[in-house]
Regions:
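Ser/Thr-glycine-rich phosphate-binding loops at phosphate-binding pockets of nucleotides
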Residues: 65, 69-70
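Cys-dependent protein tyrosine phosphatase-like superfamily
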Residues: 1-60, 72-179
Length: 179
């Protein structure tokens, strides 16, 4: 199964952003809103997690760059199965090592099509950053109180779904209901 979590249309780059700091602030706000308040995106995240639980075989989920929405839903999965926040954050930040060539190519393309000044404004959001992850996580906790409540109330998963996810992802895990 393949799930596109990019949304119904490609996002336009925001207009009127004057500095890289403006872009970072805009991005933090956008990512936090997407994770905690955008019901359409939350629905797609729930579909991704349910497909991992209930569909046999290879699973592929993606977004536009494979780092923001994909990174967030992957982090949620890791947190739901019991990984520690700091370990999930470090895994998320590894994205930069694996995408450095693509990010550089994207930046160079932006320089050639929009000019260096504009490319420099957008450059910070081509990577992943701790502050991007933290903005999403903090807003989700503020709204839902915990990742488990986010999963059930925001993403539409049941407690049984979360137990089955753990069974799928963790070697030797026995669900509470199997005890």
């Amino acid at each position: 199964m393949m799930v596109n979590i990019a949304g119904s249309k490609e996002s336009d780059l925001p207009k009127g952003i004057a500095t890289a700091e403006d872009m970072i602030n805009f991005f933090n706000s956008s990512m936090a809103n997407m994770a905690a308040h955008d019901k359409g995106t939350q629905l797609r995240f729930g579909v991704v997690i349910n497909s991992l639980i209930y569909t046999d075989g290879v699973q592929l989920y993606h977004c536009t760059a494979g780092k923001d929405r994909t990174g967030w839903v992957t982090a949620v999965i890791q947190l739901l199965v019991g990984m520690k926040y700091d370990d999930v954050l470090q895994d998320y930040l590894l994205t930069n090592a694996y995408t450095a060539d693509r990010v550089n190519a994207t930046y160079q393309y932006m320089v050639s099509t929009q000019g260096e000044a504009a490319a420099n404004i957008y450059r910070p959001v081509l990577d992943v950053r701790e502050e991007f992850f933290k903005a999403q996580f903090d807003e989700v906790i503020k709204v839902y109180g915990s990742i488990d409540k986010y999963a059930t109330e925001g993403l539409g998963l049941s407690d049984e779904d979360i137990e089955k996810l753990k069974e799928q992802m963790l070697v030797g895990y026995k669900s509470k209901s199997a005890s």
